[in-house]
């Protein structure tokens, strides 16, 4: 038992040392104090709108907060490089400018321009998701034919109209964005159509703020949404399903995960025993490690979650090890109990045999006691004979000879009747009578 408990402690210490290797990152972070206030303001403004506009306003707030958070991150706390941060900032600025200008010019821009705007914004989203990059060229070749020069001209005209209606600071941002796009087109001339236009339109449009929107703008916006949905219906069904599935957050209880465990061979370093809990723990830790989040506090929360789950799994494994040790000890005790029961049955059989021998010895003792009594009686008889003989030798007269002879005769007859020595005693009596007759003559 002591060796088993020692092995359990060693295994627990080894697992605790190995659990530290599955931590994702050691990130120190501090929450923004205005985060709760922004969330409360966004939720209070969204309560006065419909569910669709509610969700759109929450997306606006979350995107603006992500923009400010990314701009405030320094090199020590950021998980991106400087070039990645600049690319993210450019994309966020372009999305914000297109969103704000689409709200101001939604009454003047035609439905075709809105559809092209939805296509350009969808292209930015598809560019962020590398998962759809290999399918985009196939869609452009097969489903949606378009001319390269005309689309570039219409996009230039649309961007010039946006520059005219934009404030100075936004014009500066747009000019920097255009310069970055021109440099990208010079470096990658073959990907101009792929980066400017897309065959897929997003299913959700960000609505304008509730305080600045009018009923007419809302109606125009609903018509633009319908047109964008019509254009997006031209895309293949599987691509739309994949984009929607990527945005949906599925809970832990909404789907089942099937894990198949394979046991390694002896040549590959495998053993006969396979611990399922260790494999499940390693699977979840590697899954969380591969899906690294963008926010540092999510990394911190996942690290704490992995640590707590690892500790609980280690405790469960320790309990299973202790249960295994106790079960083996119980089996050993049961086997020992059976052996003791067999020994006890043998002892009982020996006891019965001793009792039988004791009874036999008692019977033999009774027989020997009877024989001893018989021998004692014979000794008494011979002693009496000796006394009679001595008396007969010393007697000179015969007044009492008849009395002595009669006593001996009576004693001999009694002895022969009691012990079955009648023939021997009869012979002895005849000898005595002959001796007595000779003595008298």
Swiss-Prot record:
Subcellular compartments: Nucleus; Chromosome, Centromere; Chromosome, Centromere, Kinetochore
Protein name (record): Inner kinetochore subunit mis17
Organism classification: Eukaryota, Fungi, Dikarya, Ascomycota, Taphrinomycotina
Family: Belongs to the CENP-U/AME1 family.
GO biological process: cell division; CENP-A containing chromatin assembly; mitotic sister chromatid segregation
Polar residues biased stretches: 160-173, 192-201
Superkingdom assignment: Eukaryota
Pfam families per the UniProt record, alphabetical: CENPU
Keyword Lipoprotein in annotation: no
Function field: Component of the kinetochore, a multiprotein complex that assembles on centromeric DNA and attaches chromosomes to spindle microtubules, mediating chromosome segregation and sister chromatid segregation during meiosis and mitosis. Component of the inner kinetochore COMA complex, which connects centromere-associated proteins and the outer kinetochore. COMA interacts with other inner kinetochore proteins to form the inner kinetochore constitutive centromere-associated network (CCAN), which serves as a structural platform for outer kinetochore assembly.
Keyword terms, alphabetized: Cell cycle, Cell division, Centromere, Chromosome, Kinetochore, Mitosis, Nucleus
Species assigned in the record: Schizosaccharomyces pombe (strain 972 / ATCC 24843)
């Amino acid at each position: 038992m002591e060796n088993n408990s020692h092995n359990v402690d060693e295994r627990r210490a080894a697992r605790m040392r190995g659990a530290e290797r599955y931590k994702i990152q050691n990130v120190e972070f501090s929450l923004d104090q205005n985060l709760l206030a922004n969330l409360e303001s966004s939720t209070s403004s969204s309560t006065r709108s419909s569910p669709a506009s509610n969700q759109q306003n929450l997306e606006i707030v979350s995107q603006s907060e992500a923009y400010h958070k990314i701009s405030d991150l320094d090199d020590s706390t950021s998980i991106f490089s400087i070039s990645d941060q600049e690319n993210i900032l450019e994309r966020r600025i372009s999305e914000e400018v297109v969103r704000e200008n689409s709200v101001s010019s939604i009454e003047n821009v035609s439905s075709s321009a809105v559809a092209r705007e939805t296509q350009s914004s969808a292209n930015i989203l598809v560019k962020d998701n590398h998962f759809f990059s290999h399918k985009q060229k196939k869609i452009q070749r097969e489903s949606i034919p378009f001319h390269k020069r005309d689309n570039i001209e219409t996009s230039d005209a649309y961007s010039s109209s946006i520059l005219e209606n934009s404030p100075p600071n936004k014009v500066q941002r747009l000019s920097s964005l255009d310069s970055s796009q021109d440099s990208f087109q010079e470096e990658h001339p073959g990907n101009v159509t792929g980066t400017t236009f897309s065959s897929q339109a997003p299913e959700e449009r960000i609505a304008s703020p509730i305080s600045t929107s009018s009923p007419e703008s809302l109606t125009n916006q609903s018509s633009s949404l319908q047109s964008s949905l019509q254009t997006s219906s031209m895309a293949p069904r599987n691509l739309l399903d994949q984009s929607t599935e990527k945005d949906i957050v599925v809970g832990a209880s909404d789907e089942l995960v099937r894990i198949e465990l394979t046991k390694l061979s002896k040549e590959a370093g495998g053993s006969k025993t396979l611990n399922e809990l260790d494999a499940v723990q390693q699977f979840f830790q590697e899954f969380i490690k591969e899906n690294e989040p963008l926010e540092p506090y999510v990394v911190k929360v996942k690290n704490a979650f992995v640590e707590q789950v690892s500790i609980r799994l280690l405790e469960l494994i320790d309990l299973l090890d202790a249960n295994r040790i106790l079960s083996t000890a119980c089996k050993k005790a049961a086997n020992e109990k059976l052996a003791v029961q067999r020994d006890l049955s043998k002892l009982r059989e020996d006891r019965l045999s001793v009792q039988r021998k004791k009874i036999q010895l008692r019977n033999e003792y009774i027989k020997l006691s009877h024989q001893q009594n018989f021998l004692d009686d014979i000794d008494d008889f011979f002693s009496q004979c000796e006394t009679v003989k001595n008396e007969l030798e010393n007697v000179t007269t015969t007044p009492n000879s008849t009395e002595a002879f009669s006593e001996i005769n009576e004693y001999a007859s009694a002895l022969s009747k009691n012990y079955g020595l009648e023939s021997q005693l009869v012979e002895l009596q005849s000898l005595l009578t002959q001796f007595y007759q000779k003595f008298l003559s």
